[in-house]
């Protein structure tokens, strides 16, 4: 299988926040932003694998600043790492105030997707071609996150087998 470059599947999606997106506190509801993060990441995973993909985990989602009605959000999504059937996508969310021009980094997330064949089973994905120093750094960090996720999963399985071993 031929490798693919990160820039060939990366996307930036722009969306203006509207009154229907607001929570009772007057900020854009976090769930609205989460859905758009998942959508942007899914586009990247599907562009890389050229098949259906499913979100299997959100490793981390951090909200840094509130988002308001009228803000133009940019969801910048790109692959960080691929495994045999899985892909980690990083998403950076920036909000632009259309009146002042101020741009704020409002959220970041890491999502893992699995590619599916026509029968809904995991299928192999193309290898990732990592070119720039930034891509290499993000790839290393993604591999570290993957190792931590696998260790956590192993610990959870052990706890289910022997609840007394978990304190």
Which residues are covered by each model-predicted region?
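Hydrophobic beta-strand-centered segment that forms part of the acyl-chain substrate-binding groove
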Residues: 6-8, 28, 39-76, 80-82, ...
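Amphipathic, well-packed alpha-helical segments that form the structural scaffold of globular domains
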Residues: 15-16, 38
């Amino acid at each position: 299988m031929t490798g693919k470059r990160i820039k060939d599947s990366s996307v930036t999606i722009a969306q203006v926040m509207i009154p229907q997106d607001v929570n009772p506190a007057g900020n854009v509801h976090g769930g609205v932003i989460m859905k758009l993060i998942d959508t942007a990441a899914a586009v990247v995973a599907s562009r890389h694998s050229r098949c259906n993909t499913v979100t299997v985990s959100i490793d981390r989602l951090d909200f840094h600043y509130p988002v308001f009605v009228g803000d133009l959000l940019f969801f910048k999504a790109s692959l960080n790492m691929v495994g045999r059937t899985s892909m980690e996508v990083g998403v950076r969310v920036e909000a632009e105030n259309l009146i002042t021009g101020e741009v704020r980094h409002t959220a970041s997330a890491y999502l893992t997707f699995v590619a599916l064949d026509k029968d809904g089973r995991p299928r192999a994905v193309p290898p990732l071609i990592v070119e720039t120093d930034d891509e290499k750094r993000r790839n290393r960090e993604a591999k570290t996150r993957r190792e931590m996720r696998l260790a956590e999963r192993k610990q959870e399985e052990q706890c289910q087998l022997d609840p007394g071993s978990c304190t």
